[in-house]
Amino acid sequence: MTMKPAFVALALAILSSTALGAEKASGWGHDWPEGYLAKPLLPDSLSLLPPSPTWGTPRQLMDEALNAEALALEGTARFRLATKDADLDFPAAADNFSCALGVEISADKTPVLYDLMRRTMTDAGHSTKLAKDKYQRKRPFQINGKKTCTPDDEAFLRDNGSYPSGHATIGWTWALILAQISPGKSNAVLERGRSFGDSRVICNVHWQSDVVEGRLLGAAVVAKLHSVAEFKADLATAKTEVTAGQSPSKDCGEETKVLEVWRH
């Protein structure tokens, strides 16, 4: 499974666009929702994050060592889950968190939460722009020449800076929001948010430091979101939806098993 080509192009356009803020992104035959955050409220990734690691430094050497470990997972169940996590198109992207939440996340069952996740994806994606444009860090597959979990996406990814990871930023944004919506499931959804970012290292498309700093940026996005009345109102409604929600219709056993093995 890969991200749909039209969505990849649109996602990269969002990340590289000069039009930042609560605007509706459109193109490739699709209209995607506006985010909650106006441009002045977006976290400044250049101020918040350290410069991307440079070659020969301890940070880069650690990234390379962790990349080598991740490459050994090709063909495993964890690699297959990482391939699923690469898909940022909906409904698949939201459903990746259904098992951890214990509730089916869908346009039909939890419409406000579903839309909230789509809109906050826009906010999280926009927040990475300044650092991505500044550092233009090359991705692991461009350096090591090894395969990724989504080969059809490589042409798009080559032109989009690796640092910080947009997927990790988005996944951690979602995890923090879902933990607030369902405190009783907070450990599970935070673990899923962490594994969502780790999947990018396993896919050979991001370095570990890209993912780590993406999580910090995701936390900054959520902090900013709490200054927006519309977001807080939708968050309250989403809590009601989840409280009354239905268990996921899919079998969560395989995902749970894969992540349990990965943790140990």
Residue ranges with predicted function:
Residues 1-8:
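Bacterial N-terminal signal peptides that target proteins for export
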Residues 9-17:
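Bacterial N-terminal signal peptides
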Residues 195-226:
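Interfacial helix-loop-helix junctions of multi-pass membrane proteins
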Residues 23-202, 227-230, 234, 242-245, ...:
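Hydrophobic alpha-helical bundle signature of multipass membrane enzymes
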